[in-house]
């Protein structure tokens, strides 16, 4: 992934660490480092988002913003490893029953506590066919108890293998042992969502005046096809380590426009997928501002082997 960033935004080192994970989250400022007076970030996000509801999103632009607005049980560190998020610790019994111990100081942006019941509601909502989440199947990857029947409409969402043992203890029961289960929990789809806001505002709960989030940032402004502005969430449990006070996401789809607006000083961070010719040119002209970061991605072929598919039939011996 190719990114261009201005070093003047924050001190060198801190900025590069923030950009590596492609989200403006909290960071430890190295001793002796002097930060710039104005801690704001304007970044291109590649396109207009389809939704800010963690259960309705499926694209990279949406995920970029959701990682700033919402925090799940676990999050990814700078090297892509799962580390504590809302859950400060966790344990399991035979990799089948997992228990997550939530931070007692975790709060929503309105100041109310984030509880285990929030995760029960959120995961049940994710699995519920009525939600029509494109990532409902993600819970199937974790083999949660009863998830297959719930998604198929054979059982109610309340039968999902999740339980709040108390306000700060969330228990998950799987249908079989899954040693890697905790690693799945960095995905945006398993972030908590605010039941009260959803029940009050319905599909409009993600509008700036209605939304409640639990991440390092909260939604300040959303002008469709123009900008989305996030501001620091002072109720976030790790707010003291949040470096950037405001983040503005722009929906610029043209790579050329993206780079031109960066070079004119309108944005601080470009999107990726830069044409090779442009990359080579900029690498020579502004080598200290062009960064190539690892990109975690999986490509695969999915074969349609249904008996009524002509090509599949022709390929059979």
Language model feature labels by segment:
Residues 74, 88-91, 163, 218-220, ...:
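Conserved positions in beta-strands of structured domains
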Residues 81, 148, 153, 159, ...:
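Gly/Pro-rich hinge or "lid" segments in bacterial periplasmic/extracellular proteins
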Residues 36-40, 47, 68, 85-87, ...:
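Extracytoplasmic
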Residues 1-25:
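Gram-negative bacterial Sec-dependent N-terminal signal peptides
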Residues 44-94, 124, 212-213:
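N-terminal lobe/hinge region of extracytoplasmic solute-binding protein
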Residues 47-63, 86, 134, 181-191, ...:
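A structural "hinge/loop" feature
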Residues 27-31, 78, 103-132, 208-211, ...:
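Extracytoplasmic/periplasmic ligand-capture domains
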Residues 25-42, 78-79, 83, 149-155, ...:
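N-terminal hydrophobic or amphipathic helices and topogenic motifs
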């Amino acid at each position: 992934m190719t990114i261009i960033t201005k070093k003047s935004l924050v001190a060198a080192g801190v900025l590069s660490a923030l950009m590596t994970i492609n989200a403006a989250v909290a960071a430890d400022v190295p001793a002796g480092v002097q930060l710039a007076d104005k801690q704001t970030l304007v970044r291109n996000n590649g396109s207009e988002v389809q939704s800010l509801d963690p259960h309705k999103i499926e694209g990279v632009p949406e995920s970029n913003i959701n990682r700033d607005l919402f925090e799940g049980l676990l999050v990814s560190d700078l090297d892509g490893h799962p580390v504590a998020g809302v859950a400060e610790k966790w344990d399991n019994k035979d990799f089948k029953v997992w228990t997550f111990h939530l931070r007692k100081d975790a709060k929503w942006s309105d100041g109310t506590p984030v509880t285990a019941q929030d995760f029960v509601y959120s995961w049940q909502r994710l699995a519920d066919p009525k939600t029509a989440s494109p990532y409902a199947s993600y819970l199937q990857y974790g083999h949660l108890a009863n998830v297959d029947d719930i998604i198929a409409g054979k059982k109610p969402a309340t039968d999902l293998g999740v339980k709040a043992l108390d306000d700060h203890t969330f228990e998950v029961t799987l249908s079989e042992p899954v040693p890697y289960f905790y690693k799945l929990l960095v995905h945006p789809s398993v972030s908590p969502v605010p039941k009260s806001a959803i029940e009050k505002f319905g599909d409009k709960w993600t509008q700036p005046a209605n939304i409640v989030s639990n991440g390092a940032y909260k939604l300040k402004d959303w002008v469709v096809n123009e900008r989305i502005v996030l501001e620091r969430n002072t109720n976030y449990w790790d707010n003291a380590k949040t470096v950037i006070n405001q983040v503005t996401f722009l929906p610029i789809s043209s790579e050329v426009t993206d780079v031109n607006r960066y070079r004119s000083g309108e944005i601080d961070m470009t999107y990726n997928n830069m044409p090779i010719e442009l990359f080579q040119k900029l690498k020579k002209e502004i080598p200290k501002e062009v960064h190539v970061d690892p990109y975690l991605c999986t490509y695969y072929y999915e074969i349609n082997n249904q008996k009524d598919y002509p090509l599949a039939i022709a390929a059979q011996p």
